[in-house]
């Protein structure tokens, strides 16, 4: 029998409830569970990994070693939508490599993520 694993994405943050508001709108997710130290968001439809926002006492320091990519068809439209929700654009212009295009951004607590056209598999 093969090994089966699933992935839950966890972001450390200062204020889970506040940050959940941003990610709920950014990903079109819904609330599953929320308290002062943890917010769990799940997809409204379909199959995707849940996102857990976990309160930690230490402030963010340095660049994330791992980040989320939000894959869309229209990068600029999505960047503008996310900026209206409180995201910040890190780079000017669009980066590209191997047919993939992306813009680096950060959420309201400075967690980095990308808006990308995705990789064609």
Regions found by a protein language model. Give the residues of each.
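Vicinal oxygen chelate
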Residues: 2-14, 32-33, 40-42, 49-53, 57-82, 101-106, ...
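Short alpha-helical
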Residues: 18, 48, 77
